[in-house]
UniProtKB/Swiss-Prot annotation:
Ca(2+) binds at residues 100, 158, 167, 201. This is Pancreatic alpha-amylase. GO terms for molecular function: alpha-amylase activity; metal ion binding. Its main location: secreted. Keywords: Calcium, Carbohydrate metabolism, Chloride, Disulfide bond, Glycosidase, Hydrolase, Metal-binding, Pyrrolidone carboxylic acid, Secreted. The active site is at 197 (nucleophile), 233 (proton donor). Gene3D superfamilies: Glycosidases, Golgi alpha-mannosidase II. The modification Pyrrolidone carboxylic acid is found at residue 1. Binds 1 Ca(2+) ion per subunit. GO terms for biological process: carbohydrate metabolic process. The keyword Hydrolase applies. It is found in: Secreted, Extracellular space. Monomer.
């Protein structure tokens, strides 16, 4: 369950946030497979509440009504088609699984759900599952409001309502079996694993109990006895009784300190500088590398939700963001996830984005817009498609090329110019200082001419970007202007001319 089940030589996944299943299937075939992406995290595929105030926010998908595969992203047939087509080209599907709760306590009653299932939040009735009042934690929560009031009390974080969301009684075998039944339906279709949403709000023992009920993966695409890859959303920035390590027995965890700290360093806040990244990873107090799912930003914290605060870098900060993602994909720590977002009309009032609720690009009837592809391979319809940015795509390939090679040949200038290699396979150099960089560095690479995969790439026998000459002694000269479009250079043995 720590093994991501990606095909050999594929080392990253991408979160295609709020994409339709039909568009993901196409993207697997036309882009993700040819460029070496290992898999896709998809938005919750099960039926959710339709929220109209505000109008169709992204977070309505984190308010389940049933476990029918029926959302704005598509129906069960479209989901099955996506899983089959992506698996057939070697790209895995990881499902965002919402297990801690159902819809909000104030969601009302009726059939305002993505498949028309009736529910009554007031009396805890979800007949389409079915769940009833006995299946929720109302009687177990010990706060006056029924909500989480104090994160210093681990019991209420697990047993009370997270922002009003009806908390499932996961100590009940019926609830565990129901949750596992939904996940097994997805496993049998062919998914490779799950992100466990709000894992911090579930007891580790309850998670283990439903994970133990899961099937092995579908042998049409996975070797016999393969187990689903599990990564648990545990926001642990320190200072609370609930820690990531309490969840290691259930497989990997999301390391939220990673993006929060990397953002602070690349922004040069609080006296931080890139030279301090020499012992990046466990040396910064992160979870062990083989337990970590890492990312620069995610769908929550790119809009100020969740964890990390203002230091988080996103596509809105494109120049610094590309450097951060480049650093992540070059560094051996953790299993890497790339973000792929949609644009929304950000509007800050008193430091808060009042439009942080905006859902995906949609048509007048509320249906999600298709992902169109422009002639230059960027995306239209307000889909950002960071995973298609040349610098990010080429670093996904870099990580595949250097897989298994050690972190090596670190260099820094005691400030914000740093470099490191991955054994004899790759080397990357950053200039995040406010002055020109001109330095000769030992790369560890075989002699020859290499094509920088940030400013361009190798196309046939020519290079569309900067060329780097590695001499017989393994050294190369690197010149990076602080005004460069992208002030970093990356070379690897797959881009040798």
């Amino acid at each position: 369950q720590y093994n991501p089940n990606t095909q050999p030589g594929r080392t990253s996944i991408v979160h295609l946030f709020e994409w339709r299943w039909a568009d993901i299937a196409l993207e697997c075939e036309r882009y993700l497979a040819p460029y070496g992406f290992g898999g896709v995290q998809v938005s919750p595929p099960n039926e959710n509440v339709i929220i109209t105030n505000p109008y169709r926010p992204w977070w309505e998908r984190y308010q389940p009504v049933s476990y029918k595969l029926c959302t704005r992203s598509g129906n069960e047939n479209e989901f099955r088609d996506m899983v089959t087509r992506c698996n057939n080209v070697g790209v895995r599907i990881y499902v965002d699984a919402v297990k801690n709760h159902m819809c909000g306590s104030g969601a009302g009653s009726g059939t305002h759900s993505t498949c028309g299932a009736y529910f009554n939040a007031g009396n805890r009735d979800s007949p389409a599952v079915p769940y009833s009042g006995w299946d929720f934690n109302d009687g177990k929560c010990r706060t006056g409001s029924g909500e989480i009031e104090n994160y210093g009390d681990a019991s209420q974080v697990r047993d009370c309502r997270l922002v009003g969301l009806l908390d499932l009684a996961l100590e009940k075998d019926y609830v565990r079996s129901t949750v596992a039944g939904y996940m097994n339906h997805l496993i049998d279709i062919g998914v490779a694993g799950f992100r466990l949403d709000a894992a911090k709000h579930m007891w580790p023992g309850d998670i283990k109990a439903f994970l133990d009920k899961l099937h092995n993966l579908n042998t049409n695409w996975f070797s016999s006895g393969s187990r689903p890859f599990i990564y648990q959303e545990v926001i642990d920035l320190g200072g609370e009784p609930i820690t990531s390590s309490q969840y290691f027995g259930n497989h990997r965890v999301t390391e939220f300190k990673y993006g929060a700290k990397l953002g602070t360093v690349i922004r040069k806040w609080n006296g931080e500088k890139m030279a301090y990244l020499k012992n990046w990873g466990e040396g910064w107090g992160f979870v062990p590398s083989d337990r970590a799912l890492v990312f620069v930003d995610n769908h929550d914290n790119q809009r100020g939700h969740g964890a990390g605060g203002a230091s988080i870098l996103t596509f809105w900060d494109a120049r610094l963001y590309k450097m951060a993602v480049g650093f992540m994909l070059a560094h051996p720590y953790g299993f890497t996830r790339v973000m792929s977002s949609f644009r929304w009309p950000r509007h800050f009032e008193n430091g808060k984005d009042v439009n942080d609720w905006y859902g995906p690009p949609s048509n007048s009837d509320g249906s999600t817009k298709e992902v169109t592809i422009n002639a230059d391979s960027t995306c239209g319809n307000d889909w950002v498609c960071e995973h298609r940015w040349r610098q990010i795509r080429n670093m996904v390939i870099f990580r595949n090329v250097v897989d298994g090679e050690p972190f090596s040949n670190w260099w820094d200038n005691n400030s914000n110019q740093v470099a490191f290699g991955r054994g004899s396979k790759g080397f990357i150099v950053f200039n995040n200082d406010d002055w020109h960089m001109n330095v000769d560095l030992y790369t560890g690479l075989p002699a020859g001419t290499y094509c920088d995969v940030i400013s361009g790439q190798k196309e046939g026998s020519r290079c569309t970007g900067i060329q780097v000459y590695v001499s017989g002694n393994g050294k190369a000269n690197f010149q990076i202007s602080n005004n460069a479009e992208d002030p970093f250079i990356a070379i690897h043995v797959g881009a040798k001319l």
